């Protein structure tokens, strides 16, 4: 995989970190003689969906050497993976795409978005004075792992798109490899506690620089996760107050970042929207029944799925805020769409109306698009803040 992405071979430290999370029984490889020429893997996750949680296969480490392109290796691995996911009863599969055009043909749709942001520190003043009873402390990795794991579990309860991470995975997210520093410092790990209870954390680096006018450093925020509004504001205040810095940068932030409304200068932060995770419904019935819906409603969806033919057909969905059920039906569909479009819509990060105007949904029954948008609406935009 490293060769296919133009990277150097992994160090012993990288291999040790990778080995702890690798599921070798879910790892595929093509060989040409003794040489590995294509790879794909899966991590077994649980994803928060609107109103619930579902098992999700995290597709990862997908690569084909340039010498072996256009031979069907990627298609064969995708087909093998999705058959395995289906056999294991995982309703969802998700991935990050190195190139956007690749995965739509396999039924993946762009389901979440994220932002990269930059803030000029002089414009980082809050509109109101911060109040709170919590405390911030710098922590080492042994302290951070259990505390950050507790925070993560609390935060993901209400955040569609977040994946469940145990201590093994939090330790992986805390890995502080030299190749990731790009001239910046080692990690700073900050824990926010209310009493003895962890409620938020931030991980960042600082890149020190000087010019003729003085210090000109950058805070590179790697992750900020908070289970309470107080923890969120306090952690951002800390990041914005690091001495000798003139700017703060961050990636993989939510599109609905409350920080903008905390700042006196609402034109900060400057943001760039990027694609997040691509989602595929591997079991349409289980996925539709496994989430909850903003309003009570009924829809018949006609789904086209050439890559996973067990998903093709008409599905009647009845759901609301407290319960949902789905079943196959022979009734005429209200809407017709393919698997990739359904994946893009499932978490609520895109609107049926938008995809309808793009020609990706056929509205058979008038008013069905508006009804679907009302049902699939969420109070939070989906967000996945972890790499895999």
Where are these regions (language model features)?
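Hydrophobic, small-residue-rich alpha-helical packing segments that form membrane-like cores
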Residues: 1, 28-30, 58, 72
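A conserved beta-turn-beta hairpin within the catalytic core of GNAT-like acetyltransferases
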Residues: 47-58, 69, 209-218
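N-terminal membrane-targeting/anchoring modules of bacterial envelope and secretion proteins
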Residues: 11, 28, 36, 40, ...
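Conserved acetyl-CoA-binding loop-helix of GNAT-fold acetyltransferases
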Residues: 59-86, 228-240
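Conserved beta-strand in the GNAT
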Residues: 29, 35-45, 56-58, 63, ...
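N-terminal, Lys/Arg-enriched amphipathic/low-complexity engagement segments
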Residues: 8-20, 25-29, 39-47, 51, ...
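Conserved active-site alpha-helix within GNAT-family acetyltransferase domains
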Residues: 86-92, 96-117, 234, 255-270
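Intrinsically disordered, low-complexity, positively biased terminal segments
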Residues: 3-7, 32, 128-388
């Amino acid at each position: 995989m490293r060769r296919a992405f133009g990277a150097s071979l992994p160090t012993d430290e990288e291999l040790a970190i990778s080995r702890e999370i690798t599921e070798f029984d879910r790892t595929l490889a093509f060989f040409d003689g003794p040489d590995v020429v294509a790879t794909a893997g899966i991590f077994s996750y649980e994803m928060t969906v609107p109103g619930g949680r579902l098992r999700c296969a995290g597709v990862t480490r997908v690569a084909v050497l340039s010498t072996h392109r256009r031979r069907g290796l990627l298609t064969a691995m995708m087909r093998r993976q999705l058959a395995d996911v289906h056999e294991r009863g995982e309703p969802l599969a998700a991935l990050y795409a190195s190139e956007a055009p690749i995965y739509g043909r396999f039924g993946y749709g762009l389901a979440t978005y994220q932002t990269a942001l930059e803030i000029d520190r002089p414009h980082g003043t809050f509109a109101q004075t911060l109040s709170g009873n919590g405390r911030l402390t710098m922590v080492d990795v042994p302290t951070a792992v259990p505390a950050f794991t507790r925070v993560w579990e609390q935060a993901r309860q209400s955040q569609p798109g977040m994946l469940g991470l145990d201590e093994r995975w939090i330790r992986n997210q805390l890995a502080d490899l030299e190749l990731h520093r790009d001239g910046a410092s080692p990690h700073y790990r900050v824990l926010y506690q209310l009493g003895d209870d962890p409620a938020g954390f931030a991980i960042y680096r600082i890149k020190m620089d000087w010019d003729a006018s003085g210090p000109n450093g950058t805070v590179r925020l790697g992750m900020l996760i908070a289970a309470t509004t107080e923890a969120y504001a306090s952690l951002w205040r800390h990041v914005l107050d690091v001495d000798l810095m003139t700017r703060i940068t961050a990636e993989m932030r939510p599109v609905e970042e409350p920080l903008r409304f905390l700042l006196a200068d609402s034109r900060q932060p400057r943001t760039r929207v990027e694609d997040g995770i691509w989602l595929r419904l591997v079991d349409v019935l289980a996925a539709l029944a496994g989430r909850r819906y903003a309003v009570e409603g009924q829809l018949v969806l006609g789904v086209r799925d050439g890559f996973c033919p067990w998903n093709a057909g008409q599905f009647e969905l009845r759901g609301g805020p407290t319960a949902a059920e789905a079943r196959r039906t022979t009734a005429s569909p209200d809407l017709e769409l393919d698997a990739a479009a359904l994946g893009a819509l499932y978490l609520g990060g895109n609107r049926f109306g938008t995809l309808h105007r793009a020609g990706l949904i056929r509205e058979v029954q008038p008013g069905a698009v508006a009804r679907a948008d009302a049902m699939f609406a969420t109070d939070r935009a989906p967000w996945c803040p972890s790499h895999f």
